[in-house]
UniProtKB/Swiss-Prot annotation:
First-level EC class: transferase
Disulfide bond residue pairs: none
Organism for this UniProt entry: Bartonella henselae (strain ATCC 49882 / DSM 28221 / CCUG 30454 / Houston 1) (Rochalimaea henselae)
Protein keywords: 4Fe-4S, Cytoplasm, Iron, Iron-sulfur, Metal-binding, S-adenosyl-L-methionine, Transferase
Cofactor: [4Fe-4S] cluster
Domain Radical SAM core: 131-369
GO biological process terms held by the UniProt record: tRNA modification
InterPro entries given in the database record: Elp3/MiaA/NifB-like_rSAM, Methylthiotransferase, Methylthiotransferase_CS, Methylthiotransferase_N, Methylthiotransferase_N_sf, NA-bd_OB-fold, Ribosomal_uS12_MeSTrfase_RimO, rSAM
UniProt main location, coarse: cytoplasm
This protein's name: Ribosomal protein uS12 methylthiotransferase RimO
Taxonomic path: Bacteria, Pseudomonadati, Pseudomonadota, Alphaproteobacteria, Hyphomicrobiales
Pfam families membership: Radical_SAM (PF04055), TRAM_2 (PF18693), UPF0004 (PF00919)
Cofactor note: Binds 2 [4Fe-4S] clusters. One cluster is coordinated with 3 cysteines and an exchangeable S-adenosyl-L-methionine.
Length: 437
């Protein structure tokens, strides 16, 4: 009997991508084949995003496409936390589950298509099924978030912080390293809060016990001999303690910190930490300890009540702090977010657009200036794409998908997943260009 075939669509953030990998790994272990084509598949699973209206619309469009091309659809993910929204538009979907509802998804698949499992065939590699290239992987250390930012509905969709015991995380990391992964990208909703909900539970690891704690996680991952990149790190005071690991090159000198804004007024309205001057002093301290540190962040412009003065404070802050990598979003009202009920004046779309362009122009100048300082240096680069002697890769300063790249010319063919030393010859606003040596 032919194995049942399932088409899979994964939408949204890296956390959702990890959810998709877990579901696919479970399905493959039971004998299901995974396809990228809806036509000819026995059913389609759509892992949705429901954070912004634009993401909800994209999710609904993908459900619509799956129904038209296949007809049998299971919906999971963040949009599934509000099943009525989906049922009102698409009443014929087979099942709807919320985020991280792995077992419910598998049960829904079993109901629609019973598994055909051959116990004599090893269907799944030790590291599980990955949707990223083989040389890097996302390592999700927790679910949910216990913060209550006024613009965000993640706690509603995914619940409060639920950390994985550190021994589980380290076992997964070790398997990935053994499978050939060269870079682990540590992700969660609030990475630096890791373990707080478990009261820093101690668990056995190899010949010792380790605490389920951000510091211990960084220390242990830093001993695995590969690139470790930290994402979604709130600037809590204890983050200071891990900068030393970066200076020692145990983990990459890279911190992804969602600052969101620099105006204390806007930050208070966002229910975010508003001690900007204190954070600035800590950034100065970090850069003294680790001069090679790269900071990446995201910001929101056009938040309700944001004045011209607030926005100018943000631009001045960019000039002062000079974040190496920054992204910017125009504020979108999210259904169910507290920000909708604060009674603050909405910002017109044309004003949001203007502020977004001004932010990006400012950051582009900063990035251009900072990247020029890399010209003439030799950097270790991990190859992401290769066309023989022409390749693209990333240095320690860049995460996949969201940051810049290094364009490489080489005398020999370069392989995806290998490290090469590159002499940087020129730069532009976001990328570097060099020759492999």
């Amino acid at each position: 009997m032919a194995a049942p075939r399932i088409s899979f669509v994964s939408l949204g953030c890296p956390k959702a991508l990890v959810d998709s990998e877990r579901i696919i790994t479970s399905l493959r272990s039971e004998g299901y084949e995974i396809s990228r084509k809806h036509q000819g598949a026995d059913l389609v699973i759509v892992n949705t995003c429901g954070f912004l209206d634009s993401a909800r619309n994209e999710s609904l469009a993908n459900i619509d496409e799956a129904l038209k091309k296949n007809g049998k659809v299971i919906v999971t993910g963040c949009l599934g936390a509000d099943p009525d929204v989906i049922r009102q538009v698409y009443p014929n979907v087979l099942a709807i589950t919320g985020p991280q509802a792995y077992e419910s998804v598998i049960q829904a698949v079993h109901t629609a298509i019973p598994p055909v499992h051959d116990p004599f065939i090893d269907l799944v590699p030790p590291q599980g099924i990955r949707l990223t290239p083989r040389h890097y992987a996302y390592l999700k250390i927790s679910e949910g978030c216990s913060n209550r930012c006024s613009f965000c509905i993640i706690p509603t969709l995914r619940g409060n912080l639920m950390s994985r015991p550190i021994s589980d995380v380290l076992r997964e990391a070790e398997k990935l390293v053994q499978a050939g992964v060269k870079e682990l990208l540590v992700i969660s909703q609030d990475t630096s809060a890791y373990g707080i909900d478990l009261k820093y539970l101690e668990t056995p690891w190899k010949d010792r016990t380790v605490k389920t704690k951000f510091f211990d996680l960084c220390r242990e991952l830093g001993n695995m001999g590969i690139w470790i990149r930290m994402h979604y790190v709130y600037p809590y005071p204890h983050v200071d303690d891990v900068i030393e690991f970066m200076a020692e090159k145990k983990i990459l000198p890279y911190l992804d910190i969602p600052f969101q804004h620099a105006s204390p007024t806007v930050l208070r309205n966002m229910k975010r930490p508003a001690l900007v001057k204190k954070i600035n002093r800590r950034i100065e301290k970090w850069r003294i300890i680790c001069p090679d540190l790269t900071l990446r962040s995201t910001f929101i412009v056009g938040f309700p009540g944001e004045t011209h003065e607030d926005f100018n404070i943000l631009l001045e802050w960019l000039d002062e702090v000079k974040i190496e990598r920054a992204g910017c979003f125009k504020y979108e009202a999210v259904k169910g977010a507290v920000a909708n009920d604060l009674g603050l004046e909405s910002i017109p779309e044309e004003v949001k657009e203007n502020r977004w362009h001004r932010f990006m122009a400012k950051q582009q100048k900063i990035s251009t200036h900072l990247l020029k300082k890399k010209v003439g240096k030799r950097l270790q680069v991990l190859i992401d794409e290769s066309q023989g002697k022409i390749a693209k890769g990333r240095s320690q300063y860049d995460a996949p998908e969201i940051d810049g790249v290094v364009h490489i010319s080489s005398r020999r063919p370069l392989r995806v997943g290998e490290f090469v030393t590159v002499k940087i010859e020129r730069s532009d606003a976001y990328d570097l260009y060099g020759i492999a040596i």
